[in-house]
Amino acid sequence: MVEARVHTGAATTKGIIMTTLNPYLGFRGNAREAMEFYQGVFGGELTISTFGDFQASVEPDEVDLVMHAQLTGDAGVVFMGSDTPKHMDYAEGSNFSMSLSGSNDDEAQLTGYFGELSAGGTVLQPLMVAPWGDSFGMLKDPFGITWLVNIAGPGASA
């Protein structure tokens, strides 16, 4: 297992904490292979957590699938990915989302984004405390784009 660590999104510009926006790629059973490939291309640090790490799998044969992976490349490229469980829709070619993340200091802003993006769309996962301690929610906006919102839990380090 690769060290499990979740990105807090606490990027700074001149000391100001800001929300980060990253692509989030979806895969069907080969997220680890894909993210390791991208690490070979971009270098940097790759962290991976499985569904089993958080007892979050619905199917017993999915415990070793990637629940969350993050690659921070040598040149600052940051993107994330995961395996899409069998019970969720998956279509190759449209297997990406946008991820908004920030610290608990950004909670009001990120909660506002969640509400505004979901207006006229569909909340797929309400914004609530997740097994890893952060607040997390997922929605599909009125234009069909899936958004993931993650707010670092209290005491999370940047």
Language-model segments: what does each one mean?
Residues 2-19, 47, 67-72, 77-82, ...:
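Vicinal oxygen chelate
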Residues 16-17, 25-76:
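Core segments of cupin and vicinal oxygen chelate
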Residues 61-62, 91-94:
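Short glycine/proline-enriched turns and hinge-like loops at secondary-structure junctions
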